UniProtKB/Swiss-Prot annotation:
Name the UniProt record assigns to this protein: Protein-L-isoaspartate O-methyltransferase
Catalysed reaction equations from the record: [protein]-L-isoaspartate + S-adenosyl-L-methionine = [protein]-L-isoaspartate alpha-methyl ester + S-adenosyl-L-homocysteine
GO terms (BP aspect): methylation; protein modification process; protein repair
The protein's role, per its UniProt record: Catalyzes the methyl esterification of L-isoaspartyl residues in peptides and proteins that result from spontaneous decomposition of normal L-aspartyl and L-asparaginyl residues. It plays a role in the repair and/or degradation of damaged proteins.
PANTHER family attached to this UniProt entry: PROTEIN-L-ISOASPARTATE O-METHYLTRANSFERASE, PROTEIN-L-ISOASPARTATE(D-ASPARTATE) O-METHYLTRANSFERASE
Length: 211
């Protein structure tokens, strides 16, 4: 079930659901999602669904990975992106093939260590990792042209807004429980523009690093 035909079916489905960025779709097509899930779930890797990866975390559904990547890239190529929530490393791997540099923060060290191994296996060398609190971002290396958050925050973290470069784009799910909305926030000359893009479902963005 990890055949090229299975991957092509996934890409066709994403296209039919309205995703149109050819570069993003090509990266999704060639990225081996089965490497980012447990072997017991590998037969489901190219279903358009989230899957558990342990520690009460999930690998996001391919549609959402592609959608959030499209939103980041909508204004053109990016050279410096901050990812909050490395998780399995799948979204990280997709970003690493779309932008010049990725800086990824994860609070669960064992998940990030596994993600590092997978990216090395795929020879993706333009990612720098930090084990820490995603609510804080990575201020030492700010600002970022794009920020993507792969867990739902109860509110938009001020630290992430502060670390967004002028013209930069922040893609983040906001809310709690059953009420979550995907938001696109753009840093403008006079402040921030906010766009609500529809209902989503993510695991919560928690505070503090966890070994």
């Amino acid at each position: 079930m990890t055949s090229q035909r299975t991957r092509e079916r996934l890409i066709q489905r994403l296209y039919e659901e309205g995703l149109s960025n050819a570069q993003v779709l090509e990266v999704i097509r060639r990225t081996p999602r089965h490497l980012f899930v447990d072997e017991a779930l590998a037969h489901r890797a190219y279903e358009d669904t989230a899957l558990p990866i342990g520690h009460n975390q999930t690998i996001s559904q391919p549609y959402m990975v592609a959608r959030m990547s499209e939103l980041l890239l909508a204004a053109g190529p990016l050279d410096k992106v901050l990812e909050i929530g490395t998780g399995s490393g799948y979204q990280t791997a997709v970003l690493a093939q779309l932008v010049e540099r990725v800086f990824s923060v994860e609070r669960i060290k064992v998940l990030q260590d596994r993600a590092k191994e997978r990216l090395v296996e795929l020879n993706l060398r333009n990612v720098v990792f930090r084990w820490g609190d995603g609510w804080e971002g990575w201020p030492a290396l700010a600002p970022y042209n794009g920020i993507i958050v792969t867990a739902v925050a109860t509110d938009v973290p001020q630290a992430l807004l502060d670390q967004l470069a002028p013209g930069g784009r922040l893609v983040i799910p906001v809310g709690s429980g059953e009420v979550q909305q995907l938001m696109l926030i753009i840093r403008e000359d006079e402040g921030f523009s906010r766009h609500v893009l529809g209902a989503v479902r993510f695991v919560p963005l928690l505070n503090g690093p966890l070994a």
